[in-house]
């Protein structure tokens, strides 16, 4: 099954015939694989490790914050994260060929209609199809934008983080400020943490870096599926002179060993909707990833049904802290 966006692209197969192609943005299906039989070459640039890992067995994949691959046609899948879209498109335009051809496709509810406004200063753009509640735009590059990744880095500090400075790139959760859920979870972290600590779904690395800052004796590992999050977490650790391992993993897919503490502010948004797959997998498998007497500590929106999941797999749970919006849950192996 292919996405709505890919169904629209499927109506324009002649554009792809005998061309070198780069798929980028929010592409998340097998359309790049299907198109291989008519294209000259197909490369995928994805920021999402779960998708990149799956596609890597079928086609060439670039899992990285940056991409300098040059092709005949770029196929960009619009996402709802405007900062992420702008970062990716400006980079693609800056690295594109003369008269670079780009197809931009996306669901209307994700804001694809703003493609014309974003790109019109750099070339000719127009809508060529509208179907499946999606828009498809054709763009031809005339003027390259200046792109400097250093201009996209953001930093912030917060009294709740002591002297920690957080570094983040576009597309990373809570890139501009400390979010309420993470702040509540931070309030439960003390200076008595020992052993191996896993920050799962680390984002810019706030939780893992704070644990290491407050507990230098702890060994921390930070993981995420998002390329920009991993780059941000690495810099947050480095700039604060904190030691830690940063690893790409889809929940526990590429994590080895067991931990004394697993902490997480797990995402529950998947695209436009809400999804619990990652959180369900986290809670289900955490029991086998904890050392004896190890602890899983997560923060979540209070309305989410995590207590039932925790009780199902651990027998019981504790609420360590709560506000009107969030709760911090703790379970032990």
UniProtKB/Swiss-Prot annotation:
CDD domains: AdoMet_MTases. This is Ribosomal RNA small subunit methyltransferase C. It is found in: Cytoplasm. PANTHER family: RIBOSOMAL RNA SMALL SUBUNIT METHYLTRANSFERASE C. Keywords: Cytoplasm, Methyltransferase, rRNA processing, S-adenosyl-L-methionine, Transferase. Belongs to the methyltransferase superfamily. RsmC family. Its EC number is 2.1.1.172. InterPro entries: DNA_methylase_N6_adenine_CS, Mtase_sm_N, rRNA_ssu_MeTfrase_C, RsmC/RlmG, SAM-dependent_MTases_sf, Small_mtfrase_dom. It comes from the Bacteria. HAMAP family: 16SrRNA_methyltr_C. The gene is rsmC. Monomer. It comes from Actinobacillus succinogenes (strain ATCC 55618 / DSM 22257 / CCUG 43843 / 130Z).
């Amino acid at each position: 099954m292919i996405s709505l966006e890919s169904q629209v692209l499927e109506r324009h197969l002649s554009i792809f015939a005998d061309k070198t192609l780069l798929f980028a943005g929010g592409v998340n299906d097998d359309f790049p694989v299907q198109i291989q039989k008519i294209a000259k070459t197909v490369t995928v640039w994805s920021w999402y490790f779960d998708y990149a890992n799956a596609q890597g067995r079928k086609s060439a994949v670039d899992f990285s914050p940056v991409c300098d691959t040059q092709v005949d046609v770029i196929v960009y899948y619009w996402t709802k994260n405007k900062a992420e879209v702008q970062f990716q498109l400006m980079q693609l335009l800056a690295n594109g060929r003369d008269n670079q051809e780009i197809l931009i496709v996306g669901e209307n509810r994700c804001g694809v209609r703003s493609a014309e406004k974003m790109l019109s200063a750099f070339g000719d753009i127009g809508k060529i199809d509208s179907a499946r509640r999606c828009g498809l735009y054709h763009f031809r590059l005339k003027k390259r934008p200046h792109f400097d990744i250093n201009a996209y880095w953001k930093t912030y500090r917060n009294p709740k983080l002591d002297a920690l400075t957080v570094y983040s790139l576009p597309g990373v959760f809570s890139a501009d400020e400390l979010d309420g859920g993470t702040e509540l979870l931070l309030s439960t972290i003390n200076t008595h943490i020992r052993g191996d600590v896993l920050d799962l779904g680390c984002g810019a690395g706030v939780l893992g870096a704070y644990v290491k800052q407050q507990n230098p004796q702890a060994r921390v590992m930070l993981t995420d599926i998002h390329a920009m999050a991993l780059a941000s977490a690495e810099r947050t650790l480095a700039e604060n002179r904190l030691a830690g391992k940063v690893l790409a993993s889809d929940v526990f897919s590429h994590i080895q060993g067991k931990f004394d503490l697993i902490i997480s502010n797990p995402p529950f948004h998947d695209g436009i909707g809400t999804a619990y797959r990652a959180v369900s997998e986290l809670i289900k498998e955490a029991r086998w990833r904890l050392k004896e007497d190890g602890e899983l500590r997560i923060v979540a929106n209070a309305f989410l049904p995590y207590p039932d999941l925790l009780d199902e797999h651990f027998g019981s749970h504790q609420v360590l802290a709560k506000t009107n919006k969030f709760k911090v849950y703790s379970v032990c192996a």
